[in-house]
């Protein structure tokens, strides 16, 4: 009996020493899980695990590469509490991950869908939702949990470097299209992050610029689209922007992230910073910015010290932790989804080809130039961009795709004949130009920036004569690309001397022979057309149509489909006609200081601060207020 009692007491002691089992996320309440977390675990959970390829105070752990190579960030796992890491990856024209992996013969290319401006030009919410479903499927099947998209900042000025990602100068169009995109993505059981909240309308000094704006303009123009998206699609997350708004960082702004977003709009998801955004981790936690990405060691230290010193009440940190855990509970990684790494890329290519045609805008079409007549078989194809088509912009909005269909390829796929000698001239010229046009590799984020385009090739009189004799019609493509860290130059809005000479020469030669000229605009942002629009017979605004761009444009040119796009941004006669142009950085240099290490702030207009003096009169609202203004198109 004594022996049995001894073993019973021994077993009880062992159980007591082990203590109760730790609560598990998904099995126990979120509150119980938070109650079991150490302060250090809480601090880790609200900051990311680092970003591969960065160093110094930017890296915390750097496990991003171990989950989905090329993804933008991950969260901190706590296995003892059943908390997995989840993956956040860039968009919005498609998932951006590494297509090639070390020691792996498989490829992981994603579909490059049309840019945001083109999708918005469809004015078709059902179509955008279908595109979102396809993108969301790739997010799911490649093992990501949250797509860092859509981007719905307002097209305040034609020169913004990331206008291609954004939808419109109109907040209603922006909000409705964003909501449709979010619904499509999230129908796959993966999340979105509507961005950049808010008033992030220039790339120049975006990490420190102070947007000075009236409450009315803020509400009616720059926040309205976000409000629509929040209320009509319930995005899982919102991404705060880099910039200040009236003197306060967006990621440290309690009125923006808590009072308005949560209390007024009833947003129930998580708020995440843009990568390296903000300065004060404690202020960000207090404001309601729940997660700091990609995560920096000094942010962890600030949060720990903030709680210990009383500057950050632990109940506030618990609130942020709860929102992160509620996000994780929804994700495929938490649900242990067995992703295939094999989405149906062929089906998604068909989606991008078809969807792009609906957003193309026919700006001019004299004498029924388009669609091509059936007798048109031979095409004189001019312009470097015809042979080197632009799928989309650069930076986090780019997609690592398997291919891009050029206009040359699209026309040939449809059975049109292209002169081989002219093709060879262009290909040799483009190859030589591309060797000269390289980025400064010393810049830490140069891979995100746009590569300079080739100077336009002007055909000789002999070449023109040969093409007029051979071809039924002339087609000229003009291209523009843009991306992160730098806004477009004034010269990018206007046509170069070489481009103007090309248009004049081709138009004169072909019109003299009674043959027509078509211009295709493969652009991500508005350009000037007033000075040359009378030269060609037709102008097709193709935007940047994704990886199937050449096929999509050919479908329109041939009459297989009708271009049904509508402009979402005004094409002004001159850049300075735009109300915001006096308060926008012109030809400013790129700034890749994503960590904003410079504490001293100067007072350079339109760089350190930008006055939104046009107030609510953005785009067409301004032009409609004038007594008389003849819009370019």
What are these regions (language model features)?
Residues 7-16:
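Bacterial N-terminal signal peptides
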Residues 4-7, 470:
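Alpha-helical transmembrane segments of integral membrane proteins
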Residues 17-633:
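Glycoside hydrolase catalytic-domain context in secreted enzymes
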